[in-house]
């Protein structure tokens, strides 16, 4: 409901209230006049009857007559003159208001649509930017993977080359030792002399001999910087493996030692129990 309609309704309610108040005031005035007129006529009738009784003497009392029906004087209400309502003007204002509201809704709709389009464009830009960043990251990752594979291939080839060279050196050393043994019999004579003298090698000498056989000649004069770095890495790995093996052997030795102690304690306990049982049987038999 518009403001004009509310004003019209309020005006009509005010008119109805004014009419009702006017009717109530008219009814109250008419009732008061009737009551005053009735009282005056009754007083006059009483005076006339008293005069007649005084003149004529005592007469028989007459019965009182019932009063007639009360008819108040009704006055038609007066409707106050008010402002006339122009319904065309109200309709025009309502149409203008609806038109303004519709125009506001249309403008808000287009503004929201413009904002949504701007957000969509920005979202597309972010998606394209993120896609380009991912493509760049994938390209960098692929290049790094290729470099890593190439580096591994080079290391593998270098390791194979060093292994083949080491094998060739070992073969050459073995051939040289065999040729020396064939040409010189000093080693055989020394072995025969030791066997004849009956000299036996101690554990320390055996250990030294085994270490001398296992120890390889470290030929690093012909290696460049990368090869030296790789050689150091191999030596470090071998030391690491030996330390790990040493640690495992120590732990195994501790476990075996613990198990031996446990078994030894069990054997001692069993021997003590068996001795006490044998003594009890003997004493019981003699009893």
Curated annotation (Swiss-Prot):
PTM summary: Phosphorylation at Thr-202 by PRKCA induces significant reduction in myofilament calcium sensitivity and actomyosin ATPase activity.
Phosphothreonine sites (modified residues): 202, 283
Gene Ontology biological process terms in this record: cardiac muscle contraction; regulation of muscle contraction; sarcomere organization
Pfam families named among the record's database cross-references: Troponin (PF00992)
Biased composition (Basic and acidic residues): 124-173, 192-208
Sites of Phosphoserine modification: 2, 197
Record field: compositional bias (Pro residues): 66-79
Molecular function in Gene Ontology: tropomyosin binding; troponin C binding; troponin I binding
InterPro entries: TNNT (IPR027707), Troponin (IPR001978), Troponin_sf (IPR038077)
Composition skew (Acidic residues), residue ranges: 1-31, 44-59
Location of N-acetylserine modifications: 2
Residue ranges of the TM segments: none
Methyltransferase among keywords: no
The keyword Nucleus is assigned to this record: no
Region (Disordered): 1-85, 124-208
A GO cellular component entry from the record: troponin complex
Family: Belongs to the troponin T family.
Entry function: Troponin T is the tropomyosin-binding subunit of troponin, the thin filament regulatory complex which confers calcium-sensitivity to striated muscle actomyosin ATPase activity.
The protein, known as: Troponin T, cardiac muscle
């Amino acid at each position: 409901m518009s403001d004009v309609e509310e004003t019209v309704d309020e005006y009509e309610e005010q008119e109805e209230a004014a009419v009702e108040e006017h009717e109530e005031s008219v009814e109250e005035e008419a009732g008061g006049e009737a009551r005053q007129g009735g009282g005056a006529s009754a007083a006059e009738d009483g005076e006339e009857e008293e005069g007649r009784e005084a003149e004529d003497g005592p007469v028989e009392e007459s019965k009182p007559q019932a009063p007639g029906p009360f008819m108040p004087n009704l006055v038609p209400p007066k409707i106050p003159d008010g402002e006339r309502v122009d319904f065309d003007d109200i309709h025009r204002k309502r149409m203008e208001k609806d038109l303004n509201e519709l125009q506001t809704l249309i403008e808000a709709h287009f503004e929201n649509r413009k904002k949504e389009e701007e957000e969509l464009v920005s979202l597309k830009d972010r998606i394209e930017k993120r896609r380009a960043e991912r493509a760049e990251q994938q390209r960098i990752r692929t290049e790094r993977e290729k470099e890593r594979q190439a580096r591994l291939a080079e290391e593998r080839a270098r390791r194979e080359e060093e292994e083949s060279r080491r094998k060739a050196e070992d073969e050459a050393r073995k051939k040289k030792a065999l040729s020396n043994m064939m040409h010189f019999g000093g080693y055989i004579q020394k072995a025969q002399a030791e066997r004849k003298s009956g000299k036996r090698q101690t554990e320390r000498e055996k250990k030294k001999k085994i270490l001398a056989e296992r120890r390889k000649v470290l030929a690093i004069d012909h290696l460049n910087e990368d090869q030296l770095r790789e050689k150091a890495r191999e030596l470090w790995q071998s030391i690491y493996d030996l330390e790990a093996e040493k640690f495992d052997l120590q732990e195994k030795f501790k476990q075996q030692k613990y198990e031996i102690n446990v078994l030894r304690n069990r054997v001692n306990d069993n021997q003590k129990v068996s001795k006490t049982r044998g003594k009890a049987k003997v004493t019981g038999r003699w009893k």
